[in-house]
Amino acid sequence: MNTATGFIVLLVXATVIGGIEAGESDMRKDVMGLFRRTICTGADRPCAACCPCCPGTSCQGPESNXISYCRND
C-alpha cells in the first residue's frame, strides 16, 4: 500500500468513527434542534414540505389560492 492509499484509508476510517460517535452524542440532538429552529417557517408564511412551521404555529389551509400557511395555534 502506498502513501496516498494509506492516507485515504485513514481518512475514511476517521470519518466513519466520527460519524458513529456523533450519532451517539447528546450534543448532536441539540445542534440539530437549533438548526431546525433556524429554518422553520414563521407565522403567516406559506408552508413548505422541506421547512416545517415554527413551534407555536401549524400549517393550515389551503387558502383560496390553494396555498397553505403557517398560522399561530
UniProtKB/Swiss-Prot annotation:
Location of this chain's protein in the cell: Secreted
Site description Important for the neurotoxic activity, residues in chain: 39
Ranges in a coiled coil: none
Propeptide: 23-35
Keyword Secreted: yes
Gene Ontology terms for molecular function: potassium channel regulator activity; toxin activity
Cystine pairs: 40-54, 47-59, 50-51, 53-70
Alphabetic keyword roster: Calcium-activated potassium channel impairing toxin, Cleavage on pair of basic residues, Disulfide bond, Ion channel impairing toxin, Knottin, Neurotoxin, Potassium channel impairing toxin, Secreted, Signal, Toxin
Tissue-by-tissue expression: Expressed by the venom gland.
Pfam families: Toxin_16 (PF07945)
GO cellular component assignments: extracellular region
InterPro entries named among the record's database cross-references: Toxin_16 (IPR012499)
Signal peptide annotation: 1-22
Marked site: Critical for the neurotoxic activity: 45-46, 50-51, 69
Annotated domain remarks: The presence of a 'disulfide through disulfide knot' structurally defines this protein as a knottin.
Role this protein plays: This excitatory toxin inhibits insect calcium-activated potassium (KCa) channels (Slo-type).
Family: Belongs to the neurotoxin 11 (kappa toxin) family.
Protein name: Lambda-hexatoxin-Hmo1d
Highest classification ranks of the organism: Eukaryota, Metazoa, Ecdysozoa, Arthropoda, Chelicerata
